[in-house]
């Protein structure tokens, strides 16, 4: 069940808006820039497969978040919680046995949730277009939306996106239930599994323990389970696995917006071959960047190199890059 949404900072604004699923509302958190640019610029953050906006772009380590950095650069920042996450309504199927339904929150459904959020934001701010930052699986609904509604999208920052991998001979993707429980141990393992054994941790235990408590707070029933765990829709994970069986949930060639792919050197979910394929597949994008940041993994936004991610994303959203020189 969703929990009441405390403000992370005093000037944060909260909105519950209608979503594409009947009788289910979506939650948006909004932090306007104190010194807004002229004209105003809005960024929508689209989260990944296991935790919502409060635990990602809005989470502060040592008093500062990615959202704060974007605000300082003049961007109004919005965070969407998909159905089944954070403060958005849960799918009714999440109250039943996980085996009784197909994986919840697939990209087609999620893209319609992104559209509902984007149209609300544009109307609220009286803007014609916005930029999107997505993480991991979140690139799938973000790019589906961008392809279907090119006039509404300024720029796309795809942080740790999932790419299509070649089909596996004699192998089909496994089937998954509707949802699963994700424990703190599951999340900690994600932070350490891709770090080379001879390298120091990319996230301190102190920071993880602080983040972990907030993660459990995102599901009102998490601490009633043994072990503690957050109920999470499995559509995103199922689509990651399908992408690695040559079934990517969107067509990159249909995206017309400028695109930046930002990834960590140690990101096991998008390697150099994946990135090259995805970069080339964005064939209609007028501006493309492939940015690899050292000593970082798939969860770079919560790691020691997070500020490098912030800087690169802001630079791209600002249109930074080499000028085109006439031939």
Predicted regions and their residues:
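Conserved hydrolase catalytic core segment
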Residues: 128-133, 137-167
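N-terminal cap/lid segment of alpha/beta-hydrolase-fold proteins
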Residues: 2-37
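Conserved acidic catalytic loop of the alpha/beta-hydrolase fold
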Residues: 108-129
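Catalytic histidine-centered segment of alpha/beta-hydrolase-like enzymes
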Residues: 296-308
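Alpha/beta-hydrolase
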Residues: 167-260
């Amino acid at each position: 069940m969703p929990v009441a949404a405390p403000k992370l900072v005093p000037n944060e604004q909260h909105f519950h808006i209608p979503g594409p699923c009947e009788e289910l509302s979506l939650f948006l958190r909004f932090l306007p820039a104190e010194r807004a640019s002229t004209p105003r610029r809005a960024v929508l953050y689209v989260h990944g497969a296991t935790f919502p906006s409060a635990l990602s772009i809005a989470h502060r380590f040592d008093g500062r978040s990615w959202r704060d950095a974007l605000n300082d650069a003049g961007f109004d920042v919005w965070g969407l919680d998909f159905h089944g996450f954070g403060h958005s309504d849960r799918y009714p199927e999440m109250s039943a046995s996980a085996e009784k339904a197909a994986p919840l929150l697939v990209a087609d459904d999620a893209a319609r949730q992104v559209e509902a959020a984007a149209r609300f934001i544009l109307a609220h701010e009286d803007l014609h277009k916005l930029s999107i930052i997505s993480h991991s699986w979140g690139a799938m609904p973000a790019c589906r939306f961008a392809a279907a509604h090119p006039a509404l999208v300024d720029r796309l920052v795809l942080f740790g996106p999932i790419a299509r991998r070649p089909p596996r001979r004699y192998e089909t993707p496994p089937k998954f239930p509707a949802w699963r429980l994700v424990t703190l141990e599951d999340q900690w393992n994600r932070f350490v599994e891709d770090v080379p054994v001879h390298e120091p941790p990319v996230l301190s235990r102190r920071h993880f323990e602080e983040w972990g408590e907030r993660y459990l707070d995102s599901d009102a029933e998490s601490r009633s389970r043994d072990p503690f765990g957050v109920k999470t829709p499995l559509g995103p994970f199922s689509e990651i696995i399908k992408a690695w069986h040559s079934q990517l949930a969107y067509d990159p060639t249909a995206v017309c917006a400028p695109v930046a792919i930002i990834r960590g050197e140690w990101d096991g979910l998008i390697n150099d071959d994946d990135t090259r394929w995805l970069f080339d597949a964005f064939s209609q994008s007028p501006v493309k960047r492939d940015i690899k940041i050292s000593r970082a993994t798939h969860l770079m936004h919560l790691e020691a190199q997070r500020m490098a991610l912030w800087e690169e994303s802001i630079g791209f959203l600002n249109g930074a890059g080499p000028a085109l020189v006439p031939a």
